[in-house]
Every structure is written in structure tokens, then in C-alpha cells.
């Protein structure tokens, strides 16, 4: 995340071209959906907490990055059981699906945030367009970096004791277990609180503007 180019947008915060997503995908592909998703979400969330521009978005960042790492890990675990070209193609697919999920959640959050603070629908949509381009660049870079790295690292780590803690062992295939249910509830709660915060902020701004006008 610290290797980045910030791009100002007409309304709202800024958008960035960076390499952070590649590490989030790599975490999912190496460690599986649970551990990889948490590593992705916690790492990205901590970055936002230490950046004044993004500190308010940190909880939502955790949720969206967790989703990216979780999906990449879920599909990647099945892919690494295969061999040859089939494995490579499925690992690429895992990375692409993880990135698409994140892009959707990120753009949705950006649009909803602008709407909640009183931005007109068309203006909010126009403000999101530059983020689509930046997100696409980030996604392509993330897949290009994380896929070969994950394959190479798994091969190297297979010769070490560390390999035993990766996602190669048999795991509980019932994904609707207490952990995933709790994380889902947490993500929904964070999203609701974030929306309520923005709504309250917009109300305060509207009241202040009314006082100024009168």
C-alpha cells in the first residue's frame, strides 16, 4: 500500500494505483479462505487506520479485503489440488474472482458514501468512474503478481515445516460454520454502522448549512 500513486477525484476522497491488492490475493492463495481472508482484511484495515484520509473507512476496508482474500483462498485451495495448465488457469480464475468481488464492494461503498453525504446521483456516478480505471489497473497488477508468486512460494515452502500450517490439510468443508457466520454478521454490522455514521454526518452538515442560510 505504501507503493502508490494517489489520484484526486472531483468529489469525495482520492483513488490510488498501488500493489496492496497483490499481497491480499497472495495471502488468500497461500493460506486459504479463513486465515488468508483475515490476513488480507486485517493488514489493509490497519493501513487505513494510520492514514487520516481513510481512517473512517477502515472497518469497511476490512470487510471488502476479507471478501477478496476469502474468495481467492476458497477457489485457490481447489485449484492447487490440480496439476499442469489446469492448476495455473484455476489459480488465475481464483485471483480474478477475488478481485472482482473487491472491486464491486469498493465501488458500491464509494457510490453509497457520496449519496449518503448528499451528492446527486449523476455526480456520484461520475466521481466513481476514475476509481473504476484505477481499480482495474490494481486488479490486473494484483493477479499478475500474486499468481506466479503463490505457485512459486508453495513449491518452495513444500520443502519446509511451514507448509503444514498452510491450506493443504483437510479442513472443515462446511463454510457456514460459527466462524464464517460470525464474520458475516460482523461485516453486516460494520456496514450498517458506517452507513449510519455517514447519514448522521450528512444531517449535521444540512443543519449547519440551514443555520448559515438563515
Predicted regions and their residues:
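Loop-helix junctions at membrane interfaces
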Residues: 1-214
